[in-house]
Amino acid sequence: MARGDLEQISIGVGSNVQDGAVLHGDPGQPVRIGADVTVGHRAVIHGATLEDGCLVGIGAIVLNGVTVGAGALVAAGSVVTKDVAPGTLVMGAPAVVKRKLPPEAIEEQRCHAQRYARLAASHAQINR
């Protein structure tokens, strides 16, 4: 659900927000999602910024004011309370950095988002 009643929500090209996810901002804290981002099932993005190519796992929560850097990976079920550096894996509650991601893993996250974009386009063609 994208609830834009208090603040703006923007979703970049090629990004996907999966079933049961919630996007919501507070005054002065919009939700900004870059290009080729995946927001997993039941994730909550609350007043946060997700930069290009990152992936937020199933059931993860990203809280107000946080920026998840480009190509970062937030593990399923994590609670993110602080900024995440680009290209890093974070996990836990609260989330902590576990390691730097190799370039291949970062590229795979973008490819994952692009596969969802192609799937959406194919469904749009079928339903015409």
PLM-predicted stretches and their roles:
Residues 4-5, 26:
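A short gly/proline-enriched turn/hairpin at secondary-structure junctions
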Residues 13, 19-20, 25, 30-33, ...:
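Glycine-rich hexapeptide-repeat left-handed beta-helix
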Residues 8-10:
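Surface-exposed loop/turn motifs in large extracellular/passenger domains
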